[in-house]
Amino acid sequence: MDDLENIIFNSVEEEIIYWKSVAMKYKQCSEEAQQELQEFQEASREYEAELEAQLQQTEGRNRDIFSENNRLRMELDSIKEKYEEQHSENYIQISTLEGDLSTTKAVRDQLQKYIRELEQANDDLERAKRATIMSLEDFEQRLNQAIERNAFLESELDEKENVLESVQRLKDEARDLRQELAVQQKQEKPKSNMVSPETERMDTSVQASIAIPLAPLTPLSQRGCASTLNSPLSFKTSWDDGYSGTPLTPCARISALNIVGDLLRKVGALESKLASCRNFVHEQSPNRPLTSVSARMNKTREGIENRLSIASGSSVEKGLIKRLEFGSLPSNTPMQGMRSPQGVVKIII
């Protein structure tokens, strides 16, 4: 407008032409603006329609999204509740498992300690077992030796009984011989009133041997009259001759009495040996049950008796031959009874 006011026209026509051109120019501008406005309105209507459509779509999507959001919120709340419940349950379970774990660890430690103690006790028991086995073997060995010793002593005891029977028989025979000697002396007294010094010495020796049977005597091999009694059978024959009425020589009578004294001494020695062996057995096995020992001794005794019952021959003569060693047996005497019972070990005391 300042430019238009500053314009100076030369004439009115120039001014009119100028203003007409300006008016045409503005008119054209207004038409263009109107056209642009119409185009803009049409475009804006189109945009508005599009925007409304988009708005409707967006609102629909928003409604869907909102409903979905509400559903998801509800699901989230339910999941949170479930999570809290599960978390509480898991917490309780974890606390319970932790308590169980601590208890299990304590039990495991106790069991490991108990296992170690059991292993130590097992080792101790194995050592004690080995020691017990060794002591048991030693004890069984000693017990077997004692049983064998007892079996041998029982056989010795049986022989002792046989010897005692023989001694008793010999005592009876000696008594009969003394009576017979007294009768013969009474018969010979009227014939000879004077007794020789040699006969007195013999009678004195006979009486001394009868009064003291256990006195130490010289062996049979050193006696002067041993030649007449070199075997039990000849000794028995001499006694039979005495019973038949044939007078015996004083030397034979003295030898018979000496044999009786030897028998008595050996019987006493056997009794002392038996007592010492019994004491030895009691000292060696004080804690052994008596039933098992007695059972085994009874079995051994039965076996020995069975084996001894099989042997043939006179037990008295065999006991005399075995224990007293009078002399060699005659050829017709069986040697089966002289053998030791099988399984019996002779122990020198």
UniProtKB/Swiss-Prot annotation:
Keywords associated with the record: Cell cycle, Cell division, Centromere, Chromosome, Coiled coil, Cytoplasm, Cytoplasmic vesicle, Cytoskeleton, Kinetochore, Membrane, Microtubule, Mitosis, Phosphoprotein
A GO biological-process term: establishment of chromosome localization
An example Gene Ontology CC term for this record: microtubule
Subunit structure of this chain's protein: Self-associates. Interacts with pafah1b1.
The family this protein is said to belong to: Belongs to the nudE family.
Name by which UniProt lists this protein: Nuclear distribution protein nudE homolog 1-B
Primary residence: cytoplasm
Cellular localization per UniProt: Cytoplasm, Cytoskeleton; Cytoplasm, Cytoskeleton, Microtubule organizing center, Centrosome; Cytoplasm, Cytoskeleton, Spindle; Chromosome, Centromere, Kinetochore
Membrane-traversing stretches: none
GO molecular function: microtubule binding
Coiled coil: 22-189
Post-translational modification: Phosphorylated in mitosis.
The protein's role, per its UniProt record: Required for centrosome duplication and formation and function of the mitotic spindle.
